[in-house]
Each structure stands twice: as C-alpha cells, then as structure tokens.
C-alpha cells in the first residue's frame, strides 16, 4: 500500500512579502481577466443556456460535425461530440428557432433525436438573478460567520480573502477555457466557498487556539488540510474525465471548476493565509 505524506515547508526561509506575492499576483491577473472580459463582452463570464435561454438537442448520427451544423437553418451555438455513445449535443441560443422546428430539421436530415431541452429567455434571466444572488448571500453569510468565530480582524479577513480568491480565480479560468456560467458551475462556486472556509478555519484553529509554536501548528494543519484537498482534487479529476467521456456536461463543468478552485485553495491557504496569520502572531498582536 502506497503511503502519502505531506512534506513540511520551511516557512522561515521566506518573508511575508515573498509568500504573499504569488497568490496576490495570481488574484490580480484573474481580476484583470474578468474585467477585460466584461469590457469586451458586457458580462464578467459567458452565461450558458441555463441563463440566456436556448435549446439543446442530443442527436445520434455517424455524420461529421460539419454535416450536423449544415442540417439546421440556424447556426448552432456549439456542437459537442460524445464519443462514448456516438452522439452530438447541439446547442442553439434563444430566438434561433423553436424546439419543434429544430427537432423537425434534425429528423429530416436523418438524425435520431435522443433528447431535447429548451429554456426560455425570461426564465433564464430570472434563474440567473436567483443563482448569483444566492452566491452573494452565501459569501456574505460565510463572512459574517467567520468574523463571529474569530472576533479578530486579521484572522477573519485572511479567511474571507482566501475564499474570495478561490472564487475569482476559477471564474477567470472559466473564461480562458471556454466554460460557460450555468447552474452547475454556480453550484461548484458555492461548494468552493465551503471547501475554502473548511481548510482556512482548520489552519486558523491550529495556529490560534492550539498549543505549540506557529510553525508546528501550521505543519499539523497542513498534514490534514493538504491531504483532504488533494484527495478532493483527485476525485474531481476522475469525475471530470468520466463525465466528459459519457457526455455529461453538467458534471464535467462542475468537476473542472472544482479542480481549478481547490488548486487555488492550496495556494491561498498555505501562502496567503499563512502570511497574514504569521504577521498577526509575531507583529500584529504586539502592537
């Protein structure tokens, strides 16, 4: 049986500025990507059919992708091949055509329509407001709870800043990798709030509330926290691969966003959060 051990990091070799520079630089780049995307497209991240409205067809055919696109009067928004069962998932934006018209065009071309899902533009807009509102409320509630737990500004802001970065970085990567904002990716962002707070509170509790010096407490927290996060990343990678092979776009998107966020969480927790806690323990408390 293979044994996994988390290597200890000698934090004494690095200054607070050196440790904080990398996560803050990555956060700044992520914010620039999101800001640039907003200027270019009018939205910080591309919304999917769940929020803009549209129609999604799953068709079975041996035809090439170009022939699938040519079978419809309206230009498809996207065409994804599902190799596992020989189907295509064809997506149309709202207003392109009715679901009945698209189904008729697909059948006239000799394609077998396995399933068809349609979302109206009005319903999609309302769903987007509810989903993003829920994300904002969840983040605000998490922030209030963290401040109530620690009742000290620096440890609390360390957790909140790490959680904020854990959400912003995946959103920027969603833009770069062409992943649209959907109900699935919003759910993944909500899960990231929980993952982030979990590892950050674990670190804060070991450093602030348990015996031992700062570096011993940090090492103990890392043994548990890093193992937990790497296990989650491995599970999400497997889920993403399997979901992609079988054409389950929702699970593939959730898994990809979670891998982005959990990887960012390792950096933010054990570089940025550790930096703020070390400053608080050795400099902030004495002031």
UniProtKB/Swiss-Prot annotation:
Compartment annotation: Cell membrane
Membrane topology: Multi-pass membrane protein
Extracellular side stretches: 40-129, 174-176, 249-251
Keyword Disulfide bond: no
Main localisation: membrane
Phenotype of null mutants: A double secD and secF deletion grows very poorly on solid medium at 45 degrees Celsius, confers a severe cold-sensitive growth phenotype (30 degrees Celsius), as well as having defects in Sec-dependent protein translocation. Has no effects on Sec-independent Tat substrate protein export.
InterPro entries: SecD/SecF_arch_bac, SecD/SecF_CS, SecD/SecF_export, SecD_SecF_C, SecF_arc
Gene Ontology biological process terms in this record: intracellular protein transmembrane transport; protein targeting
Entry keyword set: Cell membrane, Membrane, Protein transport, Translocation, Transmembrane, Transmembrane helix, Transport
Residues annotated as transmembrane: 19-39, 130-150, 153-173, 177-197, 226-248, 252-274
A Pfam family hit: SecD_SecF_C
GO cellular component, one term: plasma membrane
The family this protein is said to belong to: Belongs to the SecD/SecF family. SecF subfamily.
Record note on quaternary structure: Part of the protein translocation apparatus. Forms complexes with SecD.
Function, in words: Involved in protein export.
Protein name per the record: Protein-export membrane protein SecF
């Amino acid at each position: 049986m293979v044994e996994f051990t988390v290597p200890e990091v000698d934090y004494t070799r690095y200054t607070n500025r050196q440790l904080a520079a990398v996560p803050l630089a990555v956060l700044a780049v992520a914010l620039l990507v999101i800001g640039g995307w907003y200027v270019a497209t009018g939205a910080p991240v591309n919304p999917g059919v769940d929020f803009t409205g549209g129609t999604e067809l799953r068709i079975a055919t041996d035809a090439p992708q170009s022939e699938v696109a040519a079978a419809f009067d309206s230009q498809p928004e996207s065409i994804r091949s599902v190799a596992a069962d020989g189907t295509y998932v064809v997506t149309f934006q709202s207003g392109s055509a009715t679901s009945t018209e698209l189904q008729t065009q697909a059948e006239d071309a000799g394609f077998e329509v396995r399933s068809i899902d349609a979302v109206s533009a009005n319903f999609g807009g309302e769903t987007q407001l509810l989903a993003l509102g829920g994300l904002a409320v969840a983040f605000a509630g998490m922030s209030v709870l963290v401040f109530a737990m620690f009742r000290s500004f620096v440890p609390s802001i360390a957790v909140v800043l790490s959680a904020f970065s854990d959400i912003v970085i995946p959103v920027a990567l969603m833009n770069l990798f062409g992943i649209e904002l959907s109900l699935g990716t919003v759910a993944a962002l909500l899960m990231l709030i929980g993952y982030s707070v979990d590892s950050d509170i674990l670190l804060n509790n070991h450093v602030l509330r348990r015996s031992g010096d700062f570096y011993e407490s940090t090492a103990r927290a890392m043994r548990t926290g890093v193992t937990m996060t790497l296990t989650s990343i491995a599970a999400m990678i497997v889920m993403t691969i399997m979901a992609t092979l079988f054409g389950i776009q929702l699970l593939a998107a959730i898994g990809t966003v979670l891998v982005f966020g959990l990887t960012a969480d390792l950096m933010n927790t054990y570089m940025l959060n550790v930096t703020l806690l070390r400053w608080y323990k050795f400099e902030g408390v004495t002031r």
